[in-house]
Amino acid sequence: MQPYLDLMRHVLENGVEKSDRTGTGTLSVFGHQMRFDLAAGFPLVTTKKLHLRSIIHELLWFLRGDTNIAYLKENRVRIWDEWADENGDLGPVYGYQWRSWPRPDGGHVDQIANVVEQIKRNPDSRRLIVSAWNPALVDEMALPPCHALFQFYVAEGRLSCQLYQRSADIFLGVPFNIASYALLTHMVAQACDLAPGEFVHTLGDAHLYLNHLEQARLQLSREPRALPRLVLNPRVKDVFAFTFDDIAIEDYDPHPHIKAEVAV
């Protein structure tokens, strides 16, 4: 996970101080890219402990097309609680855009099903794209998409994924985003009988909140450990059929958790 640690160090040393929507303030850089070879291990931060249950269940929740936090709460995941309304609704956020992007004629587009089918039928396509950024509905979302658009790429029997993230909370959010999209790439690769390739993470406004700087320095003082290994149930060949029990991360030996407040 050296690319992630290098990003954190780069922002601490070169970031400019900016105000932000939450009123917390950030150190920020604009435009950064990280690459992770998924054959070299599962890209899960080891310099602090991450909550694996939250990462896995959030992705399964997205893939369900769900936008209510009831499923997350049932599975002891609290990462969306601050943004939900009194009924647990978040508006037309990621799951809705991924699975039910509205068409002008009143129908809907299942972008995930479509892209999986395209990968199988035409793996050399340059249109293997899923977007969560819908300008017509951004104002109805509890939180507009931070990880806004991703593209798959097939070469030599390997599936790679590139994510564009418009806004990147480096300390709290980015480790989750890396793991989530790496997991998604593995799942789609298995569904398409491909090997996992690279995860490429392209960031727009990459920032450390000013109340996360000491935590970031603590994390950088720790020695990275060996990456864990992702094991998927090999019998699952449908990306929508995966359950929590079909996903295992083995040999994860992180340093202790570092507490930090979420900027809402």
From Swiss-Prot:
NCBIfam families linked: PRK01827.1-3 (NF002497), PRK01827.1-5 (NF002499), thym_sym (TIGR03284)
CDD domains associated with the record: TS_Pyrimidine_HMase
Gene (UniProt): thyA
GO molecular function, one term: thymidylate synthase activity
EC primary class: transferase
Active site per UniProt: C146 (nucleophile)
List of residues binding (6R)-5,10-methylene-5,6,7,8-tetrahydrofolate: H51, D169, A263
One Pfam short name: Thymidylat_synt
Keywords: Cytoplasm, Methyltransferase, Nucleotide biosynthesis, Transferase
Disulphide-bonded residues: none
GO cellular component: cytosol
Presence of keyword Transport: no
Name of the protein described by the UniProt record: Thymidylate synthase
Cited function: Catalyzes the reductive methylation of 2'-deoxyuridine-5'-monophosphate (dUMP) to 2'-deoxythymidine-5'-monophosphate (dTMP) while utilizing 5,10-methylenetetrahydrofolate (mTHF) as the methyl donor and reductant in the reaction, yielding dihydrofolate (DHF) as a by-product. This enzymatic reaction provides an intracellular de novo source of dTMP, an essential precursor for DNA biosynthesis.
This protein's record includes keyword Disulfide bond: no
Pathways per UniProt: Pyrimidine metabolism; dTTP biosynthesis
Enzyme Commission number, as recorded: 2.1.1.45
Chemical reaction(s) catalysed: dUMP + (6R)-5,10-methylene-5,6,7,8-tetrahydrofolate = 7,8-dihydrofolate + dTMP
GO annotation terms (biological process): dTMP biosynthetic process; dTTP biosynthetic process; methylation
UniProt binding sites for dUMP: R21, R126, R127, R166, S167, A168, D169, N177, H207, L208, Y209
Similarity comment: Belongs to the thymidylate synthase family. Bacterial-type ThyA subfamily.
Organism: Chromohalobacter salexigens (strain ATCC BAA-138 / DSM 3043 / CIP 106854 / NCIMB 13768 / 1H11)
Compartments where located: Cytoplasm
Primary localization: cytoplasm
Assembly notes: Homodimer.
Domain of life from the UniProt record: Bacteria
